[in-house]
From Swiss-Prot:
Family as reported in the entry's similarity comment: Belongs to the SecA family.
Subcellular locations according to the entry: Cell membrane; Cytoplasm
Single annotated GO MF: protein-exporting ATPase activity
Organism: Bacillus thuringiensis subsp. konkukian (strain 97-27)
Pfam families linked: P-loop_SecA, SecA_DEAD, SecA_PP_bind, SecA_SW
Keywords: ATP-binding, Cell membrane, Cytoplasm, Membrane, Nucleotide-binding, Protein transport, Translocase, Translocation, Transport
EC number: 7.4.2.8
Gene3D superfamilies: Helical scaffold and wing domains of SecA, P-loop containing nucleotide triphosphate hydrolases, SecA, preprotein cross-linking domain
Protein name: Protein translocase subunit SecA 2
Main location: membrane
Function description: Part of the Sec protein translocase complex. Interacts with the SecYEG preprotein conducting channel. Has a central role in coupling the hydrolysis of ATP to the transfer of proteins into and across the cell membrane, serving as an ATP-driven molecular motor driving the stepwise translocation of polypeptide chains across the membrane.
Catalytic activity: ATP + H2O + cellular proteinSide 1 = ADP + phosphate + cellular proteinSide 2
Length: 787
């Protein structure tokens, strides 16, 4: 069997497969040995492995025997034996890479191997699934194997109590969805004591459907937000103004990146309407913020594609799955701008208190691996961003699905009529049909055409999400026609009814190319699972969104030379080159956007790491707070000197009165040496004059070292000022990000400017935090009983 692996995989992977082949042979040779062991003897292997690791052996040293142990345990507990290709998948994951395995090839069983080996290190292993149902299912299934071998297994779910979460994280292996692990990380970094934190340091994670998590959701930030009031009238006014703006004249919109900005004419119009001189003045920052969000709501978000309205509320739709993101809202006033656009009541605005992107969250794991059926097309990105390779694992059974050639029509109307004709033809044979669509809007369009053709169907989109499991279970029945958005793709199985195999299995129809070949492959993969028969075909048109967005001009040039039949079908083969090229351009554009956004997010990620490191230090009650605050006092004095002893001004022009007042406040004394242009010509002069005063004050501060109450007060107040400052800083960075795109017109690199100006904002935020702590300490020393 392993010889056939070499033929199935490309030359680039042959060396790796050779290595895996030898390791799998070694594992197989141990199978008969493991079969002779009693349950207790097999369980004792876990203890032996742990001792070996504690005494200097590595995971590499024990992996062969450990894999053999897990295989034997799975046979006894589940009645399932790992195939050779599943062992290869486990080895790929153990190395921190991606195992590409089609759905139905037993990825869940594969994950049992590396999770066991890495859990032996007693540092915790996280298994990430795409939803709570799968996390619970996999924990209960594979967890039985690991518990049989003496390991502990936990489940991390939303809405769990902190004590239960802590228990889940203390387990050797913890299952859950990625966003919940991310939110726990943010909550831990908002905790007011160490006891409230639930996570251990990150060690090793395996992500199921890794492409969905690390590619599709890469830009999605995890946000913990508080509420702040928002001006309902102002949002409605800006929405009303926006309706008078014209594309190109007043604003630009890049459909590829969904980036929008005001033109000079647009800026002038805003300034005239609101009777202001310069929109970019600091005093008009709020107006600019409301207007740019109104613009985004107006042009970048489409009803029944990006969101739906339910009970007078905006419900966001996940564009990757088609599911409603219940409880999620857009931040920084964009959600309110959408409400104003649709004439809905304005809700309170979310103010970000903590955030992190999926990308930067998972990059914190020292070792990361994953499984998916579709990752090879994104291998470059996985390698560049996460330093992971994609290894294609062959199927245990051959794939019988027939992927038919795409058909391309001149108009969308001709395409949908052809889809109806195809559905009618296949429906007569009683084969089940799944029609995949890009959005709610498109699924309802397809439904209208099927209604006109009197074809029965089930419609499955975000508006019918609660019926998803029931509807998808029926999709493999004889004569069943199912229209589905992307939501029907992952985490659900279409089981073929008895007799459907003989009819040819499930037929999948794609109604539009997705913006990634990977997502197209996911749709095709709904048919022909686990060796079932099946087929797929895409019906496209030159009016499809991807074609119009990325190749509109090319299409117009090409139209004159196209041969078209009476049904609107394009007969020229060169149209396929255009479509394939367009999809590659689209993929490249999205990759570039993710790369650009990662550059921007890396700036705030570095800042977050500094703040969270300090915060965890503050939470540590063994840390002496006096050792933390004394440098803050000295830094604050340096900043005060810099603020008052301004370069480019003569000492006679410096405001010594204000300087003395600020120094008195920080040093908690009225006895500041006389300061004037006569004795202060530089910061060094000031430092020398304040030497004795500062020494005396530091002695008073050091006296608090043995005062437990003072230590606790300083700890809590420092946390308060740090959290408050960080919340304000996140808002400032968001506003900087909003305006940074405009700098392109000034021939400046936006990413570099964001880094430079973001660093300046961060320095200001940090200085302000240190000054607040220093001032509080000065007041506390003076009158501690009143603070």
């Amino acid at each position: 069997m392993l010889n056939s692996v070499k033929k199935l995989l490309g030359d680039s992977q042959k060396r790796k497969i050779k290595n895996y082949e030898q390791i799998v042979n070694d594992i197989n040779q141990l199978e008969s040995v493991m079969e002779t062991l009693s349950d207790d003897e097999l369980r004792q292997k876990t203890v032996a492995f742990q001792h070996m690791l504690q005494n200097g052996k590595t995971v590499e040293d024990i992996k062969v025997e450990a894999f053999a142990v897990v295989r034997e345990a799975a046979k006894r507990v589940l009645g399932l034996r790992h195939y050779d290709v599943q062992l290869i998948g486990g080895l790929v994951l153990l190395e921190g890479n991606i195992a590409e395995m089609p759905t139905g090839e037993g990825k869940t069983l594969v994950s049992s191997l590396p999770t066991y080996v890495r859990a032996l290190e007693k540092k915790g292993v996280h298994v990430i699934t795409v939803n709570d149902y799968l996390a619970k299912r996999d924990k209960e299934l594979i967890g039985r194997v690991h518990e049989f071998l003496g390991l502990t297994v936990g489940l991390n779910m939303s809405q769990m109590e902190s004590i239960d979460k802590k228990r889940a994280y203390e387990a050797d292996i913890t299952y859950g969805i990625g966003t919940e692990f991310g939110f726990d990380y943010l909550r831990d970094n908002m905790a007011s004591s160490k006891a409230e934190q639930v996570q251990r340091p990150f060690h090793f994670a395996i992500i199921d459907e890794i492409d969905s998590v690390l590619i599709d959701e890469a830009k999605t930030p995890l946000i913990i937000a508080g509420k702040k009031s928002s001006s309902s009238d102002f949002h409605h006014l800006c929405a009303k103004v926006m309706k008078t703006f014209q594309d190109t004249l007043h604003y630009t919109y890049d459909a590829e990146t969904k980036a929008c900005n005001f033109t000079e004419d647009g800026i002038t119009k805003i300034e005239d309407l609101f009777d202001i001189d310069n929109l970019y003045d600091l005093e008009h920052q709020t107006l600019y913020h409301y207007m740019i969000q109104a613009l985004r709501a107006h042009v970048a978000f489409q009803l029944d594609v990006d969101y739906i309205i339910e009970d007078e509320k905006i419900m966001l739709v996940d564009i990757f799955t088609g599911r409603i993101m219940d409880g999620r809202s857009l931040s920084d006033g964009l959600h309110q701008a959408l409400e104003a656009k649709e004439g809905l009541p304005i809700t309170d605005e979310n103010q970000t208190q903590a955030s992190i992107t999926i990308q930067n969250f998972f990059r914190m794991y020292p070792a990361l691996s994953g499984m998916t059926g579709t990752a090879k097309t994104e291998e470059k990105e996985f390698n560049r961003v996460y330093n992971m390779e994609v290894i294609s694992i062959p199927t245990n059974r051959p794939i019988l699905r027939e992927d038919k050639k795409d058909v391309v029509y001149i108009t969308a109307d001709a395409k949908y009529k052809a889809v109806c004709a195809e559905v009618m033809n296949i429906h007569k044979k009683e084969r089940p049909i799944l029609i995949g669509t890009m959005s709610i809007l498109q699924s309802e369009t397809v439904a209208r055409y099927l209604d006109e053709a009197n074809l029965p169907y089930q419609l499955l989109n975000a508006k019918s999400a609660e019926q998803e499991a029931d509807l998808i279970a029926l999709a493999g029945k004889k004569g069943k026609i199912t229209i589905a958005t992307n939501m029907a793709g992952r985490g659900t199985d279409i089981l073929l009814e008895k007799g459907v195999h003989e009819l040819g299995g499930l037929h999948v129809i794609g109604t539009e190319r997705h913006e990634s070949r990977r997502v197209d492959n996911q749709l095709k993969g709904r048919a022909g699972r686990q060796g079932d028969p099946g087929s797929s075909q895409f019906f496209l048109s030159l009016e499809d969104e991807m074609i119009q967005r990325y190749a509109g001009e090319d299409v117009e040039k090409l139209k004159k030379s196209l041969k078209i039949d009476e049904n609107g079908l394009i007969l020229n083969n060169k149209i396929y080159d255009l479509i394939n090229r367009t999809q590659l351009i689209c993929e490249g554009s999205h990759f570039s956007m993710r790369e650009y956004n990662l550059k921007l997010d890396d700036v705030i990620n570095d800042q977050r790491n500094v703040v969270y490191k300090l915060r965890n230090n503050l939470l540590n009650e063994e840390v002496n707070m006096i050792e933390i605050v004394i440098p803050m006092i000295k830094n604050t004095l340096t900043v005060i000197a810099k603020d008052h002893l301004l370069e480019g001004m003569l000492p006679e022009e410096w405001d010594f009165t204000r300087l003395v007042e600020d120094l008195k406040a920080v040093l908690s004394t009225e006895e500041i040496p006389a300061l004037s242009a006569n004795n202060v010509h530089s910061a060094e002069d000031l430092q020398e004059l304040l030497k004795d005063t500062l020494t005396s004050y530091i002695e008073r501060v050091n006296a608090l070292e043995s005062d437990a109450d003072a230590q606790q007060v300083l700890r809590q107040i420092s946390l308060h000022f740090l959290d408050s400052g960080w919340t304000s800083h996140l808002s400032a960075m968001q506003h900087l990000k909003e305006g940074i795109g405009l700098r392109q017109y000034q021939q400046e690199d936006p990413a570099r400017l964001y880094q430079k100006e973001g660093f300046e904002i961060f320095l200001h935020t940090f200085s302000h935090f240190e000054k607040e702590v220093a001032l509080y300490l000065a007041r506390y020393i003076t009158v501690p009983q009143n603070i």
